[in-house]
Design a protein with these regions (language model features):
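Catalytic cores of RNA-modifying enzymes
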Residues: 1-213, 243, 254, 263-278
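Short helix-coil junctions and helix-kink-helix linkers
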Residues: 227-232
């Protein structure tokens, strides 16, 4: 079957499928990704190949990960005879994405992210080994605003800190709902993430626990959250820890920037480990 005549399947609501059908937006996303001939490009949720058609032949290898069996079959029918295209049928959150880019010298990721799994999928991309040099995602506009939000505004939260602690996050452009079929109930946006070279030193599990505890109590003073949040289980001297980091004990979590959260998470973990060893 030719690329231009691939059989199209109906969107499946259970899988959160909304296909990007606007060719102008498709090309803008590919320009944002800016694939190089030496890259391995990982595309998750390629659908009918709306973006893939612009990526085939532009990178060393294109890995298409599609959960929907019918869509995966259509992708194999279009490009299965190409040595530089791999079609992987499976759930991106379960199959271990790093296995498909392990031999890559350079990795880029692109995805039209299903709204119901946005956060776990974003972090799965950020935890790839080897790390991606660029990640371009189409997400719900509200989520895009949370990803790039600075401290001190309502949109700033655990997702903002978790992403910005390990990547430079940029709002690329808005995507109207009419660019998709079926038409979703909300607008979307494209964000660009570029992982930081020093991100390997971030204790992501401790950071995630800390930010969730803090932003679940975002209007409380930081010192009170650190003392009382059961998920933190920190029995050390909170004021001493905050003093060493030059953090005001009365500050609210929404005012702390991501690097400060990273330092605080590391200090709390060190404090707990030190207490356990005595």
């Amino acid at each position: 079957m030719s690329a231009g005549k691939a059989e199209r399947t109906r969107p499946k609501r259970a899988l959160g499928q909304n296909f990007l059908v606007d060719p102008n937006i498709q090309r803008k996303i590919v320009r944002e990704l800016d694939p190089r001939p030496t890259d391995v490009v990982l595309e998750v949720g390629p659908g009918h190949g709306e973006l893939s058609q612009y990526l085939v032949g532009r990178c060393r290898r294109l890995v298409l990960v599609e959960k929907d069996r019918d869509l995966a079959g259509g992708l194999r029918a279009r490009w299965g005879d190409r040595a530089d295209v791999d079609v992987v049928e499976g759930d991106a959150l379960r199959i271990g994405l790093s296995e498909f880019v392990r031999d890559a010298a350079a990795v880029r990721v692109v995805s039209n992210v299903p709204y119901n799994i946005t956060s776990p999928l974003v972090f799965a991309f950020l935890e790839l080994e080897p790390a991606a040099s660029r990640i371009v995602l189409t997400v719900q506009r509200e989520v895009a605003e949370r990803i790039v939000a600075p401290p001190g505004i309502k949109a700033y939260g655990a997702l903002s800190v978790g992403v910005q602690a390990i990547a430079v996050a940029s709002f690329a452009f808005r995507v109207g709902r009419q660019a998709f079929r079926p038409v979703p109930a909300v607008d979307s946006a494209v964000v660009r993430l570029e992982p930081r070279p020093d991100a390997a030193g971030v204790d992501r599990a401790s950071l995630r626990t800390l930010t969730r505890a803090c932003f679940n109590r975002r209007r409380k003073q930081l010192q009170k959250t650190l003392r009382t949040a059961p998920e933190l289980s920190f029995a050390g001297d909170v004021e001493a820890v905050l003093g060493r980091l030059s953090i005001d004990p009365a500050v609210r979590p929404e005012m702390l920037d991501p690097p400060t959260f990273v330092r605080l998470a590391a200090a709390l973990r060190a404090g707990k480990e030190g207490g356990a060893s005595r």
